[in-house]
Amino acid sequence: MNTTKEIIDDLKEGKLVIIVDDEDRENEGDLVCAADKVNSDIVNFMAKHGRGLICLTLTKEKCSILGLKQMTDSNESSNKTAFTVSIEAKEGITTGISAQDRATTILAAVNPDATKKDIAQPGHVFPLQAMDGGVPVSYTHLTLPTSSWV
């Protein structure tokens, strides 16, 4: 296990870390990186070794700016994960599924100047709206105190 400072330093350097959530939630580890540091190598590693969805955690404010609506009006999943409709960058991609295209989409979404005109729906990246309250609410990637995680 690493200290919080070590993890934050690693994220600032563009490294991947594994965040383990509460055993009463999903009891899993997530590969996490700072979204503004993502590149095709990181996305490829996540897809190959993580073997799950490539998700992008965004604040409620950022979801609003990008015009991202919740995937469903009545979230009946056991963990109430706040998925929005999937996204794609409007420019700079081909089919959207390649590691490079997904990295481009993530970078487009987290650009401080990004608006809904920069994003198309649906796509191959799955945004998650972060919970208010931060880490004291629940130990998951959705509550980490930051603006954007992949």
Where do the language-model regions lie?
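Hydrophobic alpha-helical segments, chiefly the membrane-spanning helices
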Residues: S148-V150
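Glycine-rich, N-terminal phosphate-binding loop and its surrounding beta-alpha-beta segment
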Residues: I42-A99
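A generic local secondary-structure boundary/capping motif
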Residues: E6-I8, V43-M46, Q70-E76, A114-K117, ...
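Hydrophobic alpha-helical hairpins/lids featuring a short glycine-rich hinge
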Residues: E76-A130
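N-terminal, positively charged regions that mediate nucleic acid binding
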Residues: M1-E28, V32-N39
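Conserved small/polar residues in nucleotide/adenosyl-binding loops
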Residues: T140-T146
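Fold-independent oxyanion-binding glycine-rich loops
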Residues: V20-E23, A35-D36, G50, L58-E61, ...
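Structural motif
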Residues: K15-I18, D30-L31, G52-L56, A82-V85, ...
